[in-house]
Amino acid sequence: MPETWNKLIEINLYPKVALPSYIVNTQWDFDYAPISKALRKINVTPQALLMTIYQRALRKYHEGKIDNLILGVHTHINCQSTKYSNDIFKKLPFFQTAGVAIIFIEKQENILDDLIHCRNKLKEEKNGKEACMCYCYESYLVNEKTMEINIPEKMPNIYKHNLIFVSNLGKVLVGKKNIKFGLKFDITEDGYWPNLYAFNNNETFSLVLLHPNNIDKKFIEVIHDMSVEIINFILNYKEK
């Protein structure tokens, strides 16, 4: 069992929604080139940018009540880049080699410190073993004959812990226009899990929030406003 499971705290972070409900995708587009240049200037990856946006937005939505809460960022790590990868594994397609890691982050004093904190935590995990452990552990959950997934009793409910999910999909469909990203999952009585994704096509940098159709509108507004605030911060950042 992954060690990080023992560090999770039961808490309801997301607004309650009435059932039935379904997932919709809200997308915001920005010019890619200036954002890419700004991120390189401060040596921060898009993934760290997403982590910073979501965790600061969630804390703002809760009006300071969870400022001292350590948040676990549930994200994919390419296990090919770790020291545990052999030559055969390195040749596999990406999604066959993506492990899951939970990266714990704390609130920092300002946006820049948050960006650097998230960058460093992400870098630590890329050189660690958590994603590899999860990759191996989850492979044992699949029944080879029926392909059913046997969920262990000790597996935490992702909807009811101090977990957020962000994922940068990277570069997609270069040369195409008006790209839209969509993903659906069920909303049950157990809850739901708003996801924040990013992708680019060399021209547009897109953020996509997956959320219930009847979620508190303030939640969406806070995510959007925080995205704009942090992107404007990196675009206008000047070293002291």
Where are these regions (language model features)?
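Acyl-thioester-dependent acyl-group transfer interface
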Residues: 27, 59-240
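Short, charge-rich, low-complexity alpha-helical interaction segments
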Residues: 1-6
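Gly/Ser/Thr-rich phosphate-binding loops and adjoining beta-strand/alpha-helix segments
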Residues: 10-81, 203-206
